[in-house]
Amino acid sequence: MARVTVEDCVLKIPNRFELVLVAGQRARDISAGSALTVDRDNDKNPVVSLREIADGTVDIPNLKEAVIQGLQKHVEIDEPEEDDFDAMGLDRDLMPGVALAEDDDTLEADGLTIHDGADSDLDLSDDAGQDTDEADED
């Protein structure tokens, strides 16, 4: 790699660290099959990428954006948040064949519901206990 090429690139991208990142990204793009904008002249991809940057034949802001996207670990997507109330409504729609416990028909059909008239069969008064004691004395 010629020193002249790097010095020409520093005029386009003053920060040498950023130059290395951008030139590396362009070299990876060339390896992936991107079209060359200068003649190869039997040079390797990093040298070709530096020559392209020095000549100004590549779009440097696009290369910088590609570097940023390549280094990102987590891409945050703005999605609307659902309320708990909306999620409950969705649960009902997702289970059309399953009856929910909140339905009155389901509560009556389960056989475990105590109705108002069911208590009348039981005699819970105190005289019921006395009748059994009197029967024992006889």
Swiss-Prot record:
It comes from the Bacteria. It catalyses: RNA(n) + a ribonucleoside 5'-triphosphate = RNA(n+1) + diphosphate. Residues 119-138 have a biased composition (Acidic residues). Residues 101-138 are annotated as: Disordered. Keywords: DNA-directed RNA polymerase, Nucleotidyltransferase, Transcription, Transferase. Pfam families: RNA_pol_Rpb6 (PF01192). One of its GO terms (molecular function) is DNA-directed RNA polymerase activity. Its EC number is 2.7.7.6. The keyword Transcription applies. It is an enzyme of class 2 (transferase). InterPro entries: DNA-dir_RNA_pol_omega, Pol_omega/Rpo6/RPB6, RPB6/omega-like_sf. The keyword Transferase applies. One of its GO terms (cellular component) is DNA-directed RNA polymerase complex. One of its GO terms (biological process) is DNA-templated transcription. Belongs to the RNA polymerase subunit omega family. HAMAP family: RNApol_bact_RpoZ. Promotes RNA polymerase assembly. Latches the N- and C-terminal regions of the beta' subunit thereby facilitating its interaction with the beta and alpha subunits. The RNAP catalytic core consists of 2 alpha, 1 beta, 1 beta' and 1 omega subunit. When a sigma factor is associated with the core the holoenzyme is formed, which can initiate transcription. This is DNA-directed RNA polymerase subunit omega.
